[in-house]
Amino acid sequence: MIDCRYYQQNECRSCQWLEIPYSQQLAEKQHHLKQQLISINCDKAQWLAPFQSNEQCFRNKAKMLVSGSVERPILGILKNPNDPQSAIDLCDCPLYPARFSIIFSILKDFIGRAGLVPYNIAKQKGELKYILLTESIATGKLMLRFVLRTENKLPLIRRELPKLLEKLPHLEVVSVNLQPLHAAILEGEQEIFLTEQQFLPENFNSIPLFIRPQGFFQTNPKVAEGLYATAQQWVSELPIYNLWDLFCGVGGFGLHCAKALQEKWGKPIKLTGIEISSSAILAASHSAKILGLEHVNFQSLDAASVIENKNENKPDLVIVNPPRRGIGKELSEFLNQIQPHFILYSSCNAMTMGKDLQHLTCYKPLKIQLFDMFPQTSHYEVLVLLERKKIN
């Protein structure tokens, strides 16, 4: 069991399974996964052992609500959103890398020097709402984002930034995000970069990836790297020359698979990636360029748009990595119609995935593996390789 004083003192209960031995956590998650797939014929599928995570220090990102005063800021959570006195400082949270606590101390000093008055939710006054800190495991470089209510403090931030960069030489990307609304929203639409660099380089399995401020990126890099490597391994021996990566994010799945397939078959592989986030598409396109993948087309679109494009060449493989709601009945039926030979389904919600697999009536599961992306909680990711059923 992790030694966490916040949990022991009942200050933070985000890690709801902290008292459950890790081996039991994995067993319960595996049982839950099998229950979600009970209506699917998995008799001939290969069930691989769960991919384990480190139990602590596994997160690469900290999302810290800022409260307290400008002289004594508190970085962490509010147990009661309407009560500033309920603030809990989580700078020593054992889920973060050890050096984050030192960085937080430096950032508290910066908050005072720049006069960033913490936003008071009850009074609807103040400026600084959140601090978001992300680390690249490949380089050790950092991305720092200040979520502010207005632009009023930008001149002071710019004035103090050179001193902060001296204290934190690994700080590669710094930005201000404007979120003017009095609402439980983490970030707004406008991002103001304060450094020349606008993305944080990462590298999984020799695939360059780029973390952008408003793009989604997994928070458990060790398990994410294992997830991508497994996907790459599963498809690398299959006869695939044209693949779609739907909900592609920064391109992790598609780039891993396309690179392995191109090396395997010695010919260009066609990759089409679809993602609604334009910043993620920029990152994915940059990665493809570095890898020298020529027949790649990443587009900033809703994944459902592929249903309307009847002229697109039909793929051999479709990768889907949807949000928690799953891919839904309409997209499932579309995949049944175009019948790619294989579907690779990555899910963060086994319940909706189970429903989607019921709709994918033309497919049978070949391989299934759980990835423990979120230890100390009931959440997990799962990867399933599906093959088109043979017509008798």
Curated annotation (Swiss-Prot):
Belongs to the class I-like SAM-binding methyltransferase superfamily. RNA M5U methyltransferase family. RlmC subfamily. Pfam families: tRNA_U5-meth_tr. Gene3D superfamilies: 2.40.50.1070, Vaccinia Virus protein VP39 (3.40.50.150). The gene is rlmC. CDD domains: AdoMet_MTases (cd02440). InterPro entries: 23SrRNA_MeTrfase_RlmC, MeTrfase_TrmA_AS, MeTrfase_TrmA_CS, SAM-dependent_MTases_sf, U5_MeTrfase_fam. Keywords: 4Fe-4S, Iron, Iron-sulfur, Metal-binding, Methyltransferase, rRNA processing, S-adenosyl-L-methionine, Transferase. This is 23S rRNA (uracil(747)-C(5))-methyltransferase RlmC. One of its GO terms (molecular function) is iron ion binding. It catalyses: uridine(747) in 23S rRNA + S-adenosyl-L-methionine = 5-methyluridine(747) in 23S rRNA + S-adenosyl-L-homocysteine + H(+). GO terms for biological process: rRNA base methylation. NCBIfam families: meth_trns_rumB.
